[in-house]
């Protein structure tokens, strides 16, 4: 059974890593970043829940008048 020649593996792996690095650098360099990011104004409007829109009175058994 012939021996597997691994002498070219190191140059193959190094060239693959360099190629991936260059490709990712080119992809990232095409992305446009905002020059001066500013925070958005977060004005939240308070939304009323259905039970907050109208007045309701809750009667618990202990608050009922005694008979």
Curated annotation (Swiss-Prot):
Keywords: Acetylation, ATP synthesis, CF(0), Hydrogen ion transport, Ion transport, Membrane, Mitochondrion, Transmembrane, Transmembrane helix, Transport. One of its GO terms (biological process) is proton motive force-driven ATP synthesis. The keyword Mitochondrion applies. One of its GO terms (molecular function) is proton transmembrane transporter activity. It is a single-pass membrane protein. The modification N6-acetyllysine is found at residues 54, 57. Belongs to the ATPase protein 8 family. F-type ATPases have 2 components, CF(1) - the catalytic core - and CF(0) - the membrane proton channel. Component of an ATP synthase complex composed of ATP5PB, ATP5MC1, ATP5F1E, ATP5PD, ATP5ME, ATP5PF, ATP5MF, MT-ATP6, MT-ATP8, ATP5F1A, ATP5F1B, ATP5F1D, ATP5F1C, ATP5PO, ATP5MG, ATP5MK and ATP5MJ. Interacts with PRICKLE3. Mitochondrial membrane ATP synthase (F(1)F(0) ATP synthase or Complex V) produces ATP from ADP in the presence of a proton gradient across the membrane which is generated by electron transport complexes of the respiratory chain. F-type ATPases consist of two structural domains, F(1) - containing the extramembraneous catalytic core and F(0) - containing the membrane proton channel, linked together by a central stalk and a peripheral stalk. During catalysis, ATP synthesis in the catalytic domain of F(1) is coupled via a rotary mechanism of the central stalk subunits to proton translocation. This is ATP synthase protein 8. It comes from Felis silvestris lybica (African wildcat).
């Amino acid at each position: 059974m012939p021996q597997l020649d691994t002498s070219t593996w190191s140059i193959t792996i190094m060239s693959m890593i360099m190629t991936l690095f260059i490709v990712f650098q080119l992809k990232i360099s095409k992305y446009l970043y905002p020059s001066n990011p500013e925070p958005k104004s977060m004005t939240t409007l308070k939304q009323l829940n259905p039970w907050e829109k109208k007045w309701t009175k809750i009667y618990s058994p202990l608050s009922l008048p005694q008979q």
